[in-house]
Amino acid sequence: MRAIDFHVHLPTPDWLDVSMKGYIEAAESYFRSKVVRRTIDELAGDYEAIDVMAVLLAWDAETATGRPRVPNEVVAKACREHPKTFAGFGSVDPLKGDFAVGELDRIVSLGLKGVKLHPSLQAFRPDDERFWPLYERCEELGLALLFHTGTSGIGAGQPGGQGIGLDYARPIRLDAVAAAFPSLNVIAAHFGYPWHLELLAMALHKTNIYIDISGWAPKYIPAEVIREMKGRLQNQFVFGSDYPFIQPQRCLDELKGLDIPPAVLQKVLIDNGKRLLGIA
């Protein structure tokens, strides 16, 4: 296995053309790429061809957006059908309260490894203590939490950003979460840009904060992020692409040009991800 891609959205028409309808066009412009629709089997074949494991992400922002979710069961089914190629994270809508907390047990029973949350799209502030029961149950169940942080390709370049607020996704909002739940692995996606220095300081302070580098072509990742990934935080970074918006092969190719020592690259591409997923 060459890598674990920790940030893979389903490229199926059900998600892209229904749940994400109207968002995709802005995202394509932001990423300067055309999003290609693929079936689950085609996606598995694509990742098998490059010898990369994909962590598939469910999605639930029904309360804030009114859009249909990507069910946890869909991700779990893909993982069962392609166990050597896929692992999965479920999703819950924090605004659903007790229902969301109860759904966490279902996520575990489905064999999923963590939970994906998108504060900007779900319109919630992660440091609001109303959501403490959700984090507490994740900690009890051993579920990692992957938060979208920083700016968003969804809504980018549109009037009002299509109503999406970036302040929800400030990395500092995860600091209180990581402090209150020290056994909870908190993964900050997209390294929190433009607040990446804030996130780097948090990760240096709290070893249960991890950072994924998805959503950016590696050659554009800020130098401060690369420096800490090579150095003090090499055990807390994980590889990710943000597929289908960015192709994993491009990310792997560009990482080679960043002068990252092979032992460090092994950690970022594989070892740290394995530890978070609990796989040998």
Descriptions of predicted regions:
Residues R2-P11, I107, L134, L146-H148, ...:
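A generic "structured core" feature
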Residues R37-E48, R69-A76, R80, D98-S109, ...:
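Amphipathic, non-transmembrane alpha-helical secondary structure
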Residues V8, A58-W59, G90-P94, L117-P119, ...:
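A cross-domain feature marking catalytic cores of carbohydrate-active enzymes
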Residues M1-A49, M53, D105, L233-V238, ...:
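Mid-to-C-terminal alpha-helical segments outside catalytic/metal-binding sites
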Residues K113-G114, D127-V238:
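Catalytic pocket-lining loop regions of alpha/beta-barrel enzymes
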Residues M53, A61-A156, G165:
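Active-site gating/metal-coordination segments in enzymes
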Residues H7, V75, G88, I107, ...:
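Conserved, mostly hydrophobic/aromatic
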Residues P11-D14, A61-A64, P94-D98, T151-G155, ...:
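Active-site environment of divalent metal-dependent phosphoester hydrolases
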